[in-house]
Amino acid sequence: MKGLLALRDFRLMWAAGGLDNAGRWMDTVVMGLLVLDLTDSAFQVALLFVFRWIPMLAFALISGMIADRANRWAVMMVARFVAVASTAVILALVLTGAVEPWHVFIASFFLGCLFVMEFPSRRSLIYDLVGSERIVSAMSLETINTTIGRFAGPFMAGLLIELTGFKGPYIFLMVVYVIALVLIMVLETRGPVRVKPSYSFWSTVSRGFKYSLNNSVIRSVLIITLIMNAMAFSVESLFPVVARDHLGVGAGLTGILISAQAIGSLAAATVIASLAVVRYHGRIFCLGLGLQLLSLLFFALSPWYPLSFLMLLLAGLGAAGYSTMQSTIILISAEPEMRGTALGMLGQCIGVAAVGGLAVGIVANFFSAQAAVAMSVSLGLVLLLPAVFFSPLVRRPIAQAKEVA
């Protein structure tokens, strides 16, 4: 782990990623509470989640192709500019008192575009920097990054909203995103372009689908990811509503509650990063998702804030194992010229969270937020049992794809 942080460009990317993750989780909570304050509607809060994730569903495969062909540094720079511009517009609207829900929805969409653009390019560039032998440690450090951001972002969001209203969080977000932009700007590594720029889009799409579906390991990760994001991650959009309406707490305690997942994830990701050798990546992946789903189910059933906090902490433990191994398995299993495209396929499955977010929003509108969480997670458990049972992820180690010189 120390050796990775000794690499200048990896260290800069890691620092920028930490700031970006803190900003991403912070603006997720701030936007959710802002829309809830403006509309008092659980459905519209869930709809905000849909706007954030629909770009992943629509554009992930395209962004994966770009990662295989374009300058990955340039892609990351464009994403950083999108973050700064979107946040600046919302900040101006909040400062002038002119903000409306549709403004927040559009900003959420553009920030979703940022994530989908950067997702495969960033991970492919990390693989180029560290290689296959250190990719588990690198992805664990990425998970630690996400986890710290997942803790610091909601915590700062709740604290600043309590102290300053919605102005303080957006000023803070501007500072965070500008610093992340500067850190990416000074990278020396641009990343190799392995594929010639002339290509047929639809033949590449077809090849990406065939390649991913014919590889049993990648196919299993994609199927499980699709179920997890549709049924589990989509319910996170309702956490602010559950905190306010079911647990009866304000913005400050809501931020702390949502940060609970990060505490568990940080502990688990640190342990994974310290492992010298990981043979059964798939077992960690599957154990993680099982723990996460069960914890979310008990969170939905909990009537007490301390128990809800504990359940989200345990969900974070599971999420660390799941998310660390998710990209790692894809990167190890895919051939070099197909890594970006395979990650794009993964992004498509992650983007299904938009559909799940819409579904849980509708259920919450008719019943309650906690009922929507419980129903969605329960269905996810039922669907994942056969998906895990018939996959090769638990039975054998992940084989390394052949490198092309």
Task: Kindly give the residue locations of the regions a language model identified.
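Transmembrane alpha-helix termini and helix-breaking/packing motifs in multi-pass membrane transporters
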Residues: 32-38, 90-96, 152-172, 245-246, ...
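C-terminal transmembrane bundle of multi-pass solute transporters/carriers
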Residues: 57-62, 75, 89, 102, ...
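Hydrophobic alpha-helical transmembrane segments
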Residues: 101-108, 112, 137-192, 235, ...
